[in-house]
């Protein structure tokens, strides 16, 4: 008899965004003539950069000829893309990487969810709270998260580090030792950031406690202020304690194309029970060769085009578009008296609900009264209660109209 992985049965009945979709669909059935503006899920709306489209067309044409046809590619990614990544994303910041330290993937979500494959199931886990749900759910699936306390919404083997207005959304360094810590900066969902000095405290903690930092830098392209690190490897010693995840989804509109990459430094190691130090780069490479057949050649050529002069210019135009949306939304919400965080170095706005209203209650008010969809903050963790997340990835006119509705109807 085949037995199931019973850890999956511990997961909530559905994913956060599935719950939102059900509520929105119910509303649409009962209010078919209402025009809904979606500012909840972080999907993009601007088209792919022209440079990427042209590169994809060229790559498709190559597939029509036996001389230039490409079949299976390297599981780690093609050299042309890896070299472009190192040259453009790391070398200008004084970060030196070997090509074998970069692994191209089909989006950061895959690797942030799968990285646990190379780590023991009983490692302790620390997360900032609120947090991207994938970090928690992927640890639940392998049994690492422990048991859920339904009253608090917390898992027994997870240390939650609250990020609230009271601590300026800066997580406190844990007093106890934690094996694995997830950090995402610029942060999803709060849109806030850490300075280099603040991030250095985490690197120092990790080095002192033999802690592995899993650093999600998917939104680094949106950073505007000078003292905000784009990579954890800007901090001395980080290569000995951190894995970094990057994505082209929000940088270049690749949410439907699917491409990103993970950096696993060769000097990063973890221990066996006997105390032997094992390079995580070697384990991750072995895992990828077994479970991943590589990102498509056509997709990787499109990603390479991001780093051309034309690609860089076109991507910056798109990022500026979304960040202008963020400014318009932030100003619009603040004009109604709402307290808004984020939206300066990230395309997310973290809105405090008025008068102590719960996250889901305010979600319903926005949906039914303003016909605007956000994401309830409590869906990102216990410290998200009393907040709602809005994204700046919508069309400009929709963002303006949504602010008008919120101001006039709520």
Curated annotation (Swiss-Prot):
Biological processes per GO annotation: lysine biosynthetic process via diaminopimelate, diaminopimelate-aminotransferase pathway
Recorded metabolic or biological pathway in which this protein acts: Amino-acid biosynthesis; L-lysine biosynthesis via DAP pathway; LL-2,6-diaminopimelate from (S)-tetrahydrodipicolinate (aminotransferase route): step 1/1
Chain positions recorded as substrate binding sites: 15, 42, 109, 132, 188, 293, 389
Gene3D superfamilies attached to this UniProt entry: Aspartate Aminotransferase, domain 1, Type I PLP-dependent aspartate aminotransferase-like (Major domain)
Residue numbers of N6-(pyridoxal phosphate)lysine PTMs: 250
Keyword Transferase: yes
GO molecular function ontology, one term from the record: pyridoxal phosphate binding
Binding site for pyridoxal 5'-phosphate: 72, 108-109, 132, 188, 219, 247-249, 258, 293
Keywords: Aminotransferase, Pyridoxal phosphate, Transferase
Catalytic activity, EC: 2.6.1.83
Family: Belongs to the class-I pyridoxal-phosphate-dependent aminotransferase family. LL-diaminopimelate aminotransferase subfamily.
Subunit-structure text: Homodimer.
Function as written in the Swiss-Prot or TrEMBL entry: Involved in the synthesis of meso-diaminopimelate (m-DAP or DL-DAP), required for both lysine and peptidoglycan biosynthesis. Catalyzes the direct conversion of tetrahydrodipicolinate to LL-diaminopimelate.
PANTHER family with a match to the protein in the record: AMINOTRANSFERASE
Protein name: LL-diaminopimelate aminotransferase
């Amino acid at each position: 008899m085949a037995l199931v992985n019973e850890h999956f049965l511990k997961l909530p009945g559905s994913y956060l965004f599935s719950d939102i979709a059900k509520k929105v669909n119910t509303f649409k059935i009962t209010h078919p003539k209402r025009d809904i503006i979606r500012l909840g899920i972080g999907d993009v709306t601007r088209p792919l950069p022209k440079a990427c489209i042209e590169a994809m067309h060229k790559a498709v044409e190559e597939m029509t000829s036996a001389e230039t046809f490409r079949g299976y590619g390297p599981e780690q990614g093609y050299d042309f893309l890896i070299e472009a990544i190192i040259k453009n994303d790391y070398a200008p910041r004084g970060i030196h990487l070997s090509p074998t330290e970069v692994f191209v993937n089909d989006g950061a979500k895959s690797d942030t969810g799968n990285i646990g494959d190379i780590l023991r199931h009983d490692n302790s886990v620390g997360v900032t709270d609120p947090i991207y749900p994938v970090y928690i759910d992927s640890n639940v699936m392998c049994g690492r998260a422990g048991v859920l306390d339904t009253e608090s919404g917390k898992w027994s083997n997870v240390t939650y580090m609250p990020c609230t207005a009271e601590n300026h959304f800066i997580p406190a360094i844990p007093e106890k030792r934690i094996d694995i810590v997830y950090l995402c900066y610029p942060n999803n969902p709060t849109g806030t950031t850490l300075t280099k000095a603040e991030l250095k405290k985490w690197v120092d903690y990790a080095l002192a406690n033999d802690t592995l930092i899993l650093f999600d830098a998917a939104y680094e392209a949106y950073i505007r202020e000078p003292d905000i690190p784009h990579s954890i490897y800007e901090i001395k010693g980080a290569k000995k304690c951190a894995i970094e995840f990057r994505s082209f989804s929000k940088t270049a509109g690749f949410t439907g194309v699917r491409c990103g990459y993970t950096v696993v430094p060769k000097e990063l190691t973890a221990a066996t029970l006997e105390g032997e130090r094992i390079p995580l780069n070697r384990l991750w490479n072995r895992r990828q060769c077994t479970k991943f057949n590589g990102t498509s050649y056509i997709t990787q050529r499109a990603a390479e085009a991001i780093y051309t002069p034309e690609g860089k210019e076109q991507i910056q135009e798109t990022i500026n578009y979304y960040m202008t949306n963020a400014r318009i939304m932030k100003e619009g919400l603040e004009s109604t008296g709402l307290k808004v965080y984020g939206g300066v170095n990230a395309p997310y706005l973290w809105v405090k609900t008025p008068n102590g209203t719960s996250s889901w209650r305010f979600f319903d008010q926005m949906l039914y009264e303003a016909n605007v969809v956000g994401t309830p903050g409590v869906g990102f963790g216990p410290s998200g209660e009393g907040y709602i997340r809005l994204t700046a990835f919508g069309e400009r006119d929709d963002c303006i109209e949504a602010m008008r509705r919120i101001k006039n109807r709520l």
